[in-house]
Regions:
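Flexible cytoplasmic inter-helical loops of multi-pass small-molecule transporters
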Residues: 42-68
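A late C-terminal transmembrane helix in Major Facilitator Superfamily
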Residues: 200-234
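Helix-loop-helix hairpin linking two adjacent transmembrane segments in secondary transporters
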Residues: 1-47
Length: 246
């Protein structure tokens, strides 16, 4: 979506040279962030309203947060298994998506205007597949097995993208669809596994700590990818643009 937006709002100068409008996709993202912020405040308002109604009805309030909850959670070996799976899994997906459009152009010779279409299949597919896999988990259980299958699929996908074979758009599309299955399969079994190892009264703290660990990975892995590209994968400059050998 980024490149089409930049091209749609681009301009042509007096010499006939076309210039993309970089601020357009940035503004679009800003609008989405604002919508998300407004939604957060609306949620907070209704959450406080619910707490007030529970107090008025004389219901017992939720047990307050205590620092020893953190100690209990971080000393739970099962928590760290889930947290490490989370950080490694999402660090192998989200930073990859950031570079995926450029990968489509550099390796699979996809038109830059369409390069975001193939990676865009991932979130679209997740919308459909995640509820289906969640329903499957509810029926058969076996969360560990489902997570292992999804992780193996993810390893297979990155291996196929790394190998110099079938550098054509349809192959990239097939591999991206498989990544969509893995991206939906692992979370649908991973997140419901947390209540199995953490008491309900500490679930909020556990999820917060998992996201804290995850964000460290999402901060470091893109830096690592960028460093590897700049250090070992630079190709020739073509028409003023740096190319990379993925």
């Amino acid at each position: 979506l980024t490149v089409p937006l930049a091209d749609f709002f681009g301009t042509t100068d007096e010499t006939g040279t076309f210039h993309t409008n970089i601020p357009a996709p940035i503004l679009f993202c800003l609008v989405m962030l604002c919508v998300g912020t407004i939604a957060f405040f609306i949620y907070t308002f209704y959450d406080r309203k619910l707490d007030a109604s529970l107090d008025a009805e004389g219901l017992e309030p939720e047990e307050p947060f205590r620092m020893k909850d953190i100690v209990y959670i971080i000393t739970n070996k099962g928590f760290w298994l889930i947290a490490l799976l989370c950080v490694l899994f999402y660090s192998a997906v989200f930073p990859f998506i950031k570079y995926a459009a450029d990968l489509m152009v550099q390796k699979y010779n996809v038109d830059p205007k369409l390069a975001g279409t193939i990676p865009g299949l991932l979130p679209i597919g997740a919308i459909v597949l995640t509820p289906l896999f969640g329903s499957l988990y509810d029926r058969i259980g076996k969360g560990a097995t489902l997570m292992v299958i999804g992780s193996i699929m993810l390893i297979f996908v990155h291996t196929m993208f790394a190998l110099p074979i079938l550098n054509v758009w349809w192959f990239a599309t097939v591999i991206m669809i498989i990544l969509g299955f893995a991206f939906s399969l692992v979370p649908s079994a991973m997140w419901p596994s947390v209540p199995k190892i953490i008491p309900e009264k500490q679930l909020g703290t556990a999820y917060a700590l998992i996201f804290w660990v995850q964000n460290w990975g999402l901060m470091g892995v893109p830096l690592l990818i960028g460093w590897v590209l700049n250090s070992y994968c630079k190709g020739p400059v073509v028409e003023g643009a740096q190319t990379y050998d993925y």
